[in-house]
């Protein structure tokens, strides 16, 4: 007598569950990195919004703005914020965004990234990456900060991973002067 088998055997179900588990184990870390990079992109967008004011100040005064007020952007720094960004601060021409300490991917909580300009060949070139500091407003030199508030490089956009080639924008000096 032949009987038709209905449904799946226990072995077949266990194989399917194992395959789903393996796929989830691979996909979850990739998804977490993706969400962290998306959250970091908000910080870069907010920081980039301050570049034109900082560049204009530099071209008009010959030195970098000391803070948000002198740059002509929102002050205090906590006024420039987003869903994932706590504040955006201008200090001696370096624009630094600080991530929130809650409501963001745990790998970037409280971490910082910087955008900074440098005068090169008659224009201002902007760089992005790990937090940097500039000792004085009239200097072009910057020093990379080595501390626990650095965002892991894997979460930065590819243009911000290498400080030597991380040019975000080049602004010619004539871009801020009106022809009269």
Swiss-Prot record:
N-methylphenylalanine: modified positions: 8
Coiled coil: none
Residues the record marks as carrying a glycan: 70
Gene3D superfamilies in alphabetical order: Glycoprotein, Type 4 Pilin
A Gene Ontology BP annotation from the UniProt entry: cell adhesion
Compartment(s) where it occurs, according to its Swiss-Prot or TrEMBL record: Fimbrium; Membrane
Any one of the GO CC terms: pilus
Ranges annotated as spanning the membrane: 8-28
Disulfide-linked positions: 128-160
Top-rank taxon: Bacteria
Xref: InterPro entries: N_methyl_site (IPR012902), Pilin (IPR001082), Pilin-like (IPR045584), T4P/T2SS_Core (IPR050470)
Membrane protein topology class: Single-pass membrane protein
A Pfam entry, by short name: Pilin
Chain residues in the propeptide: 1-7
Keywords, comma-separated and alphabetical: Cell adhesion, Disulfide bond, Fimbrium, Glycoprotein, Membrane, Methylation, Transmembrane, Transmembrane helix
Presence of keyword RNA-binding: no
NCBIfam families: IV_pilin_GFxxxE
Known partners and oligomeric status: The pili are polar flexible filaments of about 5.4 nanometers diameter and 2.5 micrometers average length; they consist of only a single polypeptide chain arranged in a helical configuration of five subunits per turn in the assembled pilus.
Family membership: Belongs to the N-Me-Phe pilin family.
PANTHER family the record matches: GENERAL SECRETION PATHWAY PROTEIN G, PREPILIN PEPTIDASE-DEPENDENT PROTEIN D
Role noted for this protein: Major component of the type IV pilus (T4P) that plays a role in cellular adherence, microcolony formation, resistance to neutrophil mediated killing, twitching motility as well as transformation. Mediates the attachment and the formation of bacterial microcolonies on host epithelial cells. Mechanistically, pili retractation induces host NF-kappa-B activation in infected cells, which is temporally associated with the formation of gonococcal microcolonies.
Name of the protein this chain belongs to: Type IV major pilin protein PilE1
Organism: Neisseria gonorrhoeae
Source species taxonomy: Bacteria, Pseudomonadati, Pseudomonadota, Betaproteobacteria, Neisseriales
